[in-house]
């Protein structure tokens, strides 16, 4: 199946709506050949036209051109995308649960509409009628938006920020992963120079934040796998954080202790000793067969042992990640994983839907067993979380996610992950340290934003570290030029 779009300056919306039904369909710049499977969408001088051809059968739809924007009409691109969506919904018999919504942040959209003065009735119509969103998904997004409102008031206070520190090393590469990460065994010699640079960058971030008059709100050390560092390297990094920031004023300090094959009692003790208030231990699944299939070098029992060690070390706010749709997983085995996680009684459980990343081994080796089979049924099992007292507190979506589904963080009341909410709803500055880091500067109530990027690969980050520090001066410069109500005196 190919996608061909013509007559528009950009076919972005059409392309991504087609991929709700055909996730890996390539976009072609040349007209399909006669009889070739394709979705063809075209804006013609006298109207809109969409056609789908598959297996020798064909269907098409037409519509008039929309009224001009000044007369309240839709853009031609949205109108053509809607026409194509309606055609493919009828052709495939699939109703995407989020309808025509291709954006990553539906909860943010609810916040934005409320801030703009929309009535709840108008927002309901926007989601349910204009975008054909299912009632179930929309009500979940609304409930999350309601829960987030008081938390967002803390995070959106003038000149607050969160600190992200990236550790791009892993003991092995999972088959679903496309992140830039280095194999620990192969690149071990790079780790210490990387940590040294990282500590220097953390110090520079503190200097720039102080100069700009920023107040630290939360800290997140992620990856990669942060616990791929040695215990001494964790002490060095977290010691640098403690020396440079007043942790007593931080509302949350998270460290991903994601994989039990490189997380031991000593590292868990270091993380606790140096001030982390929240950790993440991420099984992804409790099936040994599925773990082996995705490239994990540990067993389900290793996860249970790691969790017990974390509790023994005093960690009282633990998140666990699961992924729906992994190759080899079934509805039954996913339910087993979910019940196992609930039985452990962590404060957070985050349920991701598998996303088909083009650079991941799953896509390269075409291991996509669950494209449209059981993933929705797996997510239906999340009712077990609600029955166990968890509630959804943040939600986001990604392109090429199976069945256009979502990732949802569930928590016990009072254990919402602040950083997760802040980064998804884009209400505050995020200062990022490490390879691949993307600093996002926010001012004037979100009306002014700027990004500062670190070098993507660890070796380049180390070799060009002087440039990394030079770029960080853009933090203070950004706020020096802020002419809005948040300007420093």
Identify the residue ranges that each predicted region occupies.
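Short beta-strand motif preference
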Residues: 50-52, 165, 279-281
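A C-terminal junction/extension of Radical SAM enzymes
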Residues: 35-36, 355, 359-433
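Amphipathic, soluble alpha/beta structural segments
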Residues: 214-215, 219-223, 233, 401-407, ...
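N-terminal [4Fe-4S]-dependent radical SAM core
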Residues: 88-95, 115-163
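Canonical Radical SAM [4Fe-4S] cluster-binding loop centered on the CxxxCxxC motif
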Residues: 159-195
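Conserved non-cysteine loop/helix-boundary elements of the Radical SAM core domain that shape
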Residues: 181-380
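Beta-strand scaffold of nucleotide-dependent catalytic cores
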Residues: 166, 280, 348-352, 421, ...
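Radical SAM enzyme core and accessory elements
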Residues: 1-108, 112-116, 120, 413-489
């Amino acid at each position: 199946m190919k996608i061909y779009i013509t007559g528009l300056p950009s076919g972005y919306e059409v392309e991504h709506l087609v991929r709700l039904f055909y996730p890996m369909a390539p976009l072609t710049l040349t007209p399909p050949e006669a009889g070739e499977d394709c979705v063809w969408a075209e804006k013609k001088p006298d109207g809109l036209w969409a056609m789908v051809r598959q297996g020798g059968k064909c269907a098409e739809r037409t519509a008039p051109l929309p009224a001009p924007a000044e007369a309240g009409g839709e853009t031609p691109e949205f109108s053509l995308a809607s026409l194509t969506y309606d055609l493919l919904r009828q052709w495939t018999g699939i109703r995407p649960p989020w309808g025509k919504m291709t954006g990553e942040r539906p909860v943010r959209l609810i916040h934005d509409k409320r801030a703009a003065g929309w009535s709840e009735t108008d927002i309901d119509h926007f989601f349910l009628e204009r975008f054909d969103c299912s009632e179930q998904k929309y009500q979940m997004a609304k409930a999350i938006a309601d829960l987030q409102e008081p938390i967002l008031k803390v995070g959106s206070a003038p000149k607050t920020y969160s600190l992200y520190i990236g550790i791009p090393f892993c003991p092995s590469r999972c088959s679903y992963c496309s992140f830039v990460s280095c194999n620990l065994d192969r690149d071990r010699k790079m780790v210490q120079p990387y940590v040294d640079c990282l500590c220097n960058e953390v110090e520079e971030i503190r200097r720039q934040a102080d100069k700009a008059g920023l107040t630290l709100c939360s800290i997140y050390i992620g990856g990669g796998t942060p616990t791929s560092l040695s215990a001494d390297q964790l002490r060095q990094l977290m010691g640098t954080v403690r020396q440079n920031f007043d942790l007593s004023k931080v509302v949350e300090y998270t460290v991903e202790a994601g994989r039990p094959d490189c997380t031991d009692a000593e590292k868990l003790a270091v993380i606790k000793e140096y001030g982390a208030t929240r950790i993440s231990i991420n099984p992804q699944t409790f099936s040994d067969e599925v773990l082996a299939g995705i490239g994990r070098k540990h067993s389900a029992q290793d996860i249970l042992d790691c969790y017990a060690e974390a509790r023994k070390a005093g960690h009282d706010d633990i998140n666990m990640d699961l992924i729906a749709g992994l190759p080899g997983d079934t509805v039954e085995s996913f339910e087993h994983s979910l019940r196992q996680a609930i039985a452990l009684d962590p404060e957070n459980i985050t349920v991701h839907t598998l996303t088909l990343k083009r650079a991941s081994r799953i896509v390269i080796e075409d291991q996509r067993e669950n494209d449209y089979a059981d993933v929705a049924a797996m997510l239906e099992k999340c009712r077990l979380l609600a029955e166990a007292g968890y509630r959804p507190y943040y939600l986001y979506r990604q392109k090429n996610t199976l069945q256009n589904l979502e990732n949802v963080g569930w928590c016990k009341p009072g254990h919402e992950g602040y950083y997760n909410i802040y980064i998804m709803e884009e209400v505050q500055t995020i200062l990022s340290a490490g390879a691949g880091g993307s600093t996002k500067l926010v001012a004037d109530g979100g009306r002014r934003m700027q990004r500062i990027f670190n070098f993507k690969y660890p070796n380049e980050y180390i070799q060009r570290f002087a440039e990394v520090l030079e770029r960080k001066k853009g933090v203070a410069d950004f706020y020096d030029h802020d002419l809005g109500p948040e300007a420093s005196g």
